[in-house]
Amino acid sequence: GTKRGYLFRTEAELAQQEKIWKTKATFWSEDEMADYFRQNNVRTILDLSFTKFLPIEEIRAHHDYAFKFQRKHPDVVFGHWLQFDPRRALEAIREFDRALAAGAGFVGLCVNGQVLGIPPSDPCWDPLYQLAIEAGRPIMILTGLTGIGQGLPGGKGIVLDHGHPRHIDAVAARFPNLRILAARPAYPWQDDMLAVLAHKPNVHYELHGWGPRQYSPALKKAIAGRLADRVMFGCDFPVLRYEKVMADWNAEDYSREVLEKVLYRNAEAYFAADQGGNR
């Protein structure tokens, strides 16, 4: 990734990347990163996760930087997931409205309850869920084990249960018109996540952060069966590289039809109505 947009901002955080993900940080220029996506036949949605703790003026500046990158390279960057602190909901609503009007591809909201210390089912998130419904955009909710804080004292204060699929289930029940994209394979609660997906048709599944070799047998079976039209590929760039994750997918015993659905067809269908622009 680029140095300005990189998830990890300190030397200690960069050291954690090497320890947990077994990869080293490499900083590229914007054009180099876009060329890397092209070389790997990628059209991506990037996640600006670190900005949620910043003052709103700095958040806007980072968003404008990201939007400029998307406008220059729309062939490889479909858009961005934006993260906000729900305790600053008015700021978030105003900035999301500005982002929708920016003409920089897709923009959607991402919820990371673990890092913020607020589970996704907490009512303080409700204004952002309502905002996503009104804007006609999906919302991505992270679930399962996070590498953030892993191995640090107290896990850096992160409560893993804030990423349990039960919170996605509660949100999906409370907001049946909200399009929810559960993100990460939900380890160690993969069966719980599969139950939510079976019960709540407004929930789909994106699998970044883990290669398919590490999925549970039940999840692997569901990908080729009842979830074949509702699950989609995710990488976790830059801590994971596309060439490695793609090789792992191609090594699995999936039919070409299933692989095409997971790798791009399901995402094309899911985001067909989210081609950018105003509400």
Where are these regions (language model features)?
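Mid-to-C-terminal alpha-helical segments outside catalytic/metal-binding sites
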Residues: 1-44, 227-232, 240-279
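Alpha-helical scaffolding within the catalytic cores
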Residues: 27-34, 63-67, 94-96, 165-168, ...
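Conserved, mostly hydrophobic/aromatic
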Residues: 37, 66, 99, 132, ...
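N-terminal cationic-hydrophobic initiation segments that often serve targeting/anchoring roles
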Residues: 37, 70, 74, 100, ...
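Catalytic pocket-lining loop regions of alpha/beta-barrel enzymes
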Residues: 106-108, 117-232
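Charged, low-complexity C-terminal accessory regions
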Residues: 110-115, 234-237, 244
